[in-house]
């Protein structure tokens, strides 16, 4: 008996990510420095941890409602209203999820059907496509490499018209992984002017919204496209809480009434103690990202200076904590091969650009969510490698 042939056929479209393949290829290199992680190197603020401890001591160990604690939804509502001028009712327009990843899964499985198309500016975070594929839908990438990784209204409308009636949604992630680019209010208004002409969902992955470096606050498309937008956010990046798995969905009540169905049968509810910690994070800790941002800016600028001097082309990222650098001419443009050789010779790991789709080939992504000491040593070894290659 061979039951493997009876698995969901959509799984055949899903492969182990190139990130994991690359990690496995270099995993046995002793003492390797990793600038690969998509999570803060900072620890969760002490006052947030104390709130979780209090919840445990008070025996807050039972299920919450499917939507999450009302106190948390109120805190989240106040937070996004103050920070981003978003207006979502805590009673019926906010869902608490197990990380932004579950928020995305619940959203995409709720809105997509077999044969649907989803537009995605590329290069892009590789986690969207497997979810889309599992429901029998298809990602259609929009190449942004010739425009500084920024989606323009013209590019967007052209892609919308090409897909026709099968187009169900657009995913827009900003500040973006892997490029670190973000959008100004004017750029978003121009995109919104296109999007509101079409009956499609706009899924906004804004999990890096607290990590912007322009001096201006993050602008959410939810302020412009309330009747179309589903906003995904979370506390992993803003409060260094990746392991707590706490995400949020903000959407109109008519949307959440449907989204809660997929959320409920995926997970029932988010972790209760983590929810109590999140209340503290979004109230007393609403500015906890500020010290991290100062460190990230210093690290970003140091890396850009060093890599630019070595011939890498870099569009300065205005958010998140990634550098997406084009491999200089004259070197191996196969990002996997280039970085595998670099790792083997100098014991430093970045992520191949090809891990972020075909439009990422020829680039490397490195995370500056690492100590300055680690970054300086990595840049020193990179300089040696480029000189010797």
Q: What are the residue ranges of the model-derived segments?
A:
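Conserved N-terminal alpha-helix of the aminotransferase class I/II PLP-enzyme fold
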Residues: 64-98
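A short acidic, glycine-rich active-site loop
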Residues: 59-63
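PLP-dependent class I/II
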Residues: 1-7, 12-15, 20, 25-29, ...
């Amino acid at each position: 008996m061979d039951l493997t042939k009876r698995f969901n056929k959509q799984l055949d479209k899903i492969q182990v990510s190139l990130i994991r393949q690359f990690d496995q290829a270099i995993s046995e290199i002793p003492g390797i420095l990793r600038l690969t992680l998509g999570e803060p190197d900072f620890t969760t603020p002490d006052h947030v941890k104390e709130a979780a401890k209090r919840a445990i001591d008070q025996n807050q160990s039972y299920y919450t409602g499917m939507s999450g604690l009302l106190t948390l939804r109120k805190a989240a509502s106040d937070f996004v209203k103050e920070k981003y001028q978003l207006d979502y009712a805590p009673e019926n327009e906010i869902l608490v999820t197990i990380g932004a990843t579950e928020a995305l899964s619940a959203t995409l499985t709720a809105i997509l059907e077999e044969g649907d198309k989803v537009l995605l500016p590329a290069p892009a975070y590789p986690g969207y496509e497997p979810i889309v594929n599992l429901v029998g839908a298809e990602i259609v990438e929009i190449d942004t490499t010739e425009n500084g990784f920024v989606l323009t209204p013209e590019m967007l409308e052209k892609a919308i018209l090409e897909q026709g009636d099968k187009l169900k949604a657009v995913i827009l992630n900003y500040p973006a992984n892997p490029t670190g680019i973000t959008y100004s209010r004017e750029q978003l208004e121009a995109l919104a002017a296109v999007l509101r002409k079409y009956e499609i969902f706009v899924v906004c992955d804004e999990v890096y919204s607290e990590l912007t470096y322009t001096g201006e606050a993050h602008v959410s498309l939810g302020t412009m496209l309330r009747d179309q937008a589903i906003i995904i956010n979370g506390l992993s990046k803003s409060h260094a809480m990746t392991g707590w798995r706490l995400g949020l969905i903000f959407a109109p009540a008519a949307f959440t009434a449907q989204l809660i169905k997929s959320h409920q049968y995926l997970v029932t509810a988010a972790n209760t103690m983590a929810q109590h910690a999140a209340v503290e994070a979004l109230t007393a800790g609403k500015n906890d990202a500020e010290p991290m941002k100062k460190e990230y800016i210093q690290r970003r600028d140091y890396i850009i200076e060093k890599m630019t001097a070595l011939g890498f082309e870099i569009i300065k990222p205005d958010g998140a904590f990634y550098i997406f650098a084009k491999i200089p001419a004259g070197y191996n443009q196969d990002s996997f091969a280039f970085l595998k050789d670099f790792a083997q010779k100098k014991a430093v790991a970045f992520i191949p650009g090809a891990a972020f789709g075909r439009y990422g080939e020829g680039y490397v992504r490195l995370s500056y969510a690492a100590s300055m000491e680690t970054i300086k040593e990595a840049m020193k070894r990179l300089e040696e490698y480029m000189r010797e290659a």
